């Protein structure tokens, strides 16, 4: 606030307002600096872990190919394999979350067939779902449905959502998967536009004592006892990536029913671009 020409109480008030403004500005700058430092630290640590972790995974793979007769040693190898793969996933999740929060993520937007991506992901998870007796009930068009998105990041979103189902769905239940067309508000709020939605519903194996919006916060898990393996980053990454690609991501909970809905603009209603 310009203090020129002010005096008395007005000058005192102006100085107070300016001090508050300066304090807020300093706090914001400090917070942004802390966030950058935090993001840089996570990125550097993740990169530093990557090389030795890759070596461990490769050596475990070589050991698994050897003839090992001792059952106890075989058990140790399996545990080592599982834990190293989990650490690899956690490292990748941390790196992805860091890129998103720091704004260092580069998106390669292109024409994506969402039906094809859904079928591909379903095929890759079919064996895992069978192990838990999970039955997929799919309602999707047989023809191609196109959206504008980043291919690799779209798969990451889908993979995270299906991983979440695999970890937390009640065994022997159905998973309802719907893909279709809808109307939704445009990004600038100026009106509605044609969109493509993907809805995933499953029954949770445990009570969901958490608000839907909290499930997309980092390191928050529906399994408070942490008896299942996970980083607590999967849904957060899925939401942030979806929104970075101009999509909508929404979670709803009704008792033990968990539902997530994604919406993307139809390809006809968006202008193609190569990078963001």
Q: Which stretches of residues belong to each language-model region?
A:
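Short beta-strand/loop element within the Bergerat-fold HATPase_c
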Residues: 172-193
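Short helix-loop "hinge" at the ATP-lid/N-box region of the Bergerat-fold HATPase_c
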Residues: 164-166
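Short conserved segment of the HATPase_c
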Residues: 207-221
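Conserved micro-motifs of the catalytic ATP-binding
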Residues: 102-107, 146-149
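Conserved catalytic submotifs in the C-terminal HATPase_c
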Residues: 108-112, 130, 135-145, 182
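A conserved beta-strand-to-alpha-helix junction within the catalytic ATP-binding
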Residues: 108-122
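Glycine-rich ATP-binding loops of the HATPase_c
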Residues: 246-254, 259
């Amino acid at each position: 606030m310009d203090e020129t020409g002010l005096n008395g109480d007005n000058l005192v008030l102006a100085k107070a307002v300016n001090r508050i403004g300066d304090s807020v500005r300093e706090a914001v700058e400090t917070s942004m600096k802390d966030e950058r430092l935090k993001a840089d630290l996570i990125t550097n640590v993740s990169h530093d872990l990557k090389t030795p972790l890759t070596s461990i995974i490769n050596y475990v793979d070589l050991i698994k190919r050897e003839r090992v007769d001792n059952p106890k040693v075989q058990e140790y190898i399996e545990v080592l394999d599982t834990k190293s793969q989990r650490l690899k996933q956690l490292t990748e999740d941390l790196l992805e979350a860091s890129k998103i929060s720091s704004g260092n993520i580069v998106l390669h937007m292109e024409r994506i067939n969402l039906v094809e991506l859904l079928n591909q992901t379903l095929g890759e998870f079919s064996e895992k779902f069978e192990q838990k007796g999970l039955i997929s009930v799919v309602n999707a068009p047989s023809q191609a449905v196109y959206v504008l998105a980043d291919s690799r990041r779209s798969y990451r979103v889908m993979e995270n959502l299906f991983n979440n189902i695999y970890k937390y769905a009640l065994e022997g239940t159905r998973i309802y998967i719907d893909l279709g067309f809808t109307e939704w508000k445009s990004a600038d709020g100026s009106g509605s536009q044609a969109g493509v939605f993907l809805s995933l519903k499953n029954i949770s194996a445990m009570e969901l004592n958490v608000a839907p919006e909290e499930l997309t916060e980092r390191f928050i898990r529906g399994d408070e006892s942490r008896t299942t393996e996970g980083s607590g980053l999967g849904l957060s990454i899925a939401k942030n990536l979806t929104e970075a690609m101009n999509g909508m991501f929404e979670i709803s909970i009704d008792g033990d029913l968990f539902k997530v809905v994604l919406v993307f603009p139809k390809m006809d209603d968006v202008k193609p671009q190569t990078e963001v």
